[in-house]
């Protein structure tokens, strides 16, 4: 799938090195085809890594995507240059009158706070509410999945006794739903979080369906009844080294973290991690883009304004 991005975005060179089809805006403008407009609200601290992870994950269909990165106005990121944010990101206020085919809201390292205590919570709430009328389908990742379930359906998160960190076995529950087409009966997904959601509360809500889960980490993919909201509690987009960097960070902070489960060869942090979730991640993002965005979004996004 060609991804339309700014020519100077740092991720562009890395994607081209990996043989990912990237199209600059000049070439895209000469094609007689409407690209899918995808907005990404990037709340992760390392913006550049997350940009690369998500663009890589979105690159495995023949669909043409036009990516818009969003940042919050209520919080200024400290792990990326101001010039990068000014050049490649928009504020919500700049795009709120537009419509998008898809929206991705990422995780964020604020899970131990109550939602209302998060600096940018009010802004995230505004974006989540806006998405119901301006976006065909929204994909919520990790913390964002918990935030979306809480805001839209009143389902609370809870703090776990021990952090979930590693690559965990999952299984599908509803084989007829498009979101899990191509999934193996057993598949693996990275998780890295200190909080979880109440599976029973989700099951009691008639608007929600758990379509995949893990015996160890709980609900993984949750859909609303229309497919306009997809909640993913793990990190299928993670790079092979993402959990390693988090583990090393926590060791340096003196947190005495457990070794990420099912991740390092022989569970030895001195050995290279094994990426066992690539095929699943490709299938999940392909299914969301194709069946929940492309197949149902109107050709003229602005027609119903």
PLM segments and residue spans:
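Amide-donor transfer/coupling interface in amidating biosynthetic enzymes
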Residues: 1-74, 88-95, 99, 126, ...
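Acidic/histidine-rich helix-loop elements
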Residues: 79-80
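Cysteine-nucleophile active-site neighborhood
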Residues: 105-174
């Amino acid at each position: 799938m060609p991804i339309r991005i700014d020519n100077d975005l740092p991720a562009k060179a890395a994607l081209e090195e990996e043989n990912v089809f990237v199209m600059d805006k000049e070439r895209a403008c000469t094609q007689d085809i409407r690209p899918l407009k995808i907005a990404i609200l990037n709340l992760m601290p390392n913006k550049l890594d997350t940009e690369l992870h998500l663009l890589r994950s979105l690159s495995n269909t023949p669909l043409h995507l036009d990516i818009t990165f969003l940042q919050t106005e209520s919080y200024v990121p400290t792990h990326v240059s101001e010039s990068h944010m000014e050049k490649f990101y928009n504020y919500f206020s700049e795009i709120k009158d537009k419509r998008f085919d898809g929206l991705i809201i990422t995780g964020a390292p604020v899970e131990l706070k109550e939602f209302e205590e998060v600096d940018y919570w009010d802004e995230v709430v505004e974006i989540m509410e806006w998405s119901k009328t301006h976006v065909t389908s929204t994909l919520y990742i990790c913390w964002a999945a918990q935030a979306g379930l809480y805001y839209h359906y009143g389902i609370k998160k809870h703090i776990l006794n021990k952090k979930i960190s590693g690559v965990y076995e999952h299984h599908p529950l509803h084989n007829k739903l498009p979101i899990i087409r191509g999934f193996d009966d057993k598949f693996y997904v990275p998780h890295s979080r200190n909080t979880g959601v109440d599976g029973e509360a989700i099951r009691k809500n008639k608007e929600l369906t758990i379509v995949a889960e893990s015996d160890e980490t709980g609900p993984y993919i949750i859909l609303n009844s229309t497919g306009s909201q997809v909640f993913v509690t793990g990190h299928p987009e993670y790079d092979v080294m993402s959990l390693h960097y988090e583990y090393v960070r926590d060791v340096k902070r003196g947190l005495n973290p457990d070794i990420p489960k099912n991740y390092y060869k022989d569970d030895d942090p001195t050995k290279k991690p094994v990426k066992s979730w690539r095929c699943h991640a490709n299938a999940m993002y392909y299914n969301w883009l194709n069946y929940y965005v492309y197949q149902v979004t109107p050709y003229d996004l602005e027609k119903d304004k």
